[in-house]
Amino acid sequence: MARRLQVSFYERGHQTGVYLFPDDQPAPPSYQHSPIVAEYFAHCEEERRRRSGARARLIGSPGEIFPNTALHPRQPRTIAAWHPRGTHQTEVWRWYLVDKAAPSEVKDFLRGYYIRYSGPAGMTEQDDMENWNYAHAASRGTIARRYAYSYEQGMGFEIEDYESDGLRIPGTVMDITEAKSSEHNLRNLYRRWTEFMEAGSWEALATWRRNAKAMAAE
């Protein structure tokens, strides 16, 4: 069974999700409606495993590069930049990634898939944005403003130096396979944002520089 992990990098404010599969688990067949598309993605999976070695057990999930860039490493492969446009609005720029060398049949398939799945007219994007809009509106209400929100889900279960069958995963890891959910990555985002708001200089924010200098001095 695959393990579902959240991975945070405290010093930078970045975070992501990954699925950790057993070493001997085969990849499920995909895109079977078209032989050309199916063969292409089967080839891509073979190449991924060959190039990644032991890390091929890791399958990427949505993640964030602090402060406002989001990525989706699997399908649909996208990069998004979130731009605040005032207190109550955010503008999103999203890029969709297609392999330049992919056959025309694959490019046509991905174009249709991306439009149906993601983007302003996509099935999941509309659903996600509806949730965010309602959550934002509710947060402006009287009761919501009266009480502080709790972001404690999963606290105390973080793991440093996570290892599985010899594969070490950097960062601070939260295993949510059984729990299904955690606010571990969100806390990391807000933690880093707070540091930016309170820091007196860029040097105070670049903690990795101080660590590197300390190691060099030793």
Predicted regions span which residues?
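C-terminal catalytic domain of Rieske-type non-heme iron oxygenases
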Residues: 1-218
